[in-house]
Amino acid sequence: MEQELMRIGVSLPEKLLSRFDEIISQRGYSSRSEGIRDAIRNYIIHYEWMSDVEGERVGVITIVYSHHQRGLVDSLTDIQHEFGSIINSSLHVHLDKDNCLEVVILRGEGKDVRRAAERMMALKGVKHVKLTTTSVGAEL
């Protein structure tokens, strides 16, 4: 059964759209819409995977962000203080004149690790966030 398609509008930075167009062309998509549908499916799968994090976990949150975004550094710091009881370490790297990389290592309940990552993902100026989790090793 074919689903009804809904038309939406999306505003994207030119550079991001250009890179997306290159990738969908290389992958052989028939249209930009097909590439966007695939990207949304992958986003949903990633979200569902993140939601399934239970029990004690070790997590690594990798964040790439613009350090020019007003208030972003303070917001990231505030979130790290809020989750200070589960954050073991963080590393800050200046990637170039515009971008920084933050790596945050956490250990705690999976839901808390996930919440910390989601809070960072939602901040304006954050370009990329990746959460990787693993067992603490006790059940291995």
UniProtKB/Swiss-Prot annotation:
Free-text cofactor note: Binds 1 nickel ion per subunit.
Positions bound to Ni(2+): 81, 92, 94, 100
Recorded GO MF terms: DNA binding; DNA-binding transcription factor activity; nickel cation binding
Keywords for the protein's UniProt record, in alphabetical order: DNA-binding, Metal-binding, Nickel, Transcription, Transcription regulation
A Gene Ontology BP annotation from the UniProt entry: response to nickel cation
Cofactor: Ni(2+)
One Pfam family named in its UniProt record: NikR_C
Domain of life, source organism: Archaea
Family (UniProt): Belongs to the transcriptional regulatory CopG/NikR family.
HAMAP family named among the record's database cross-references: NikR (MF_00476)
The protein's name in its UniProt record: Putative nickel-responsive regulator
Organism ancestry: Archaea, Methanobacteriati, Methanobacteriota, Stenosarchaea group, Methanomicrobia
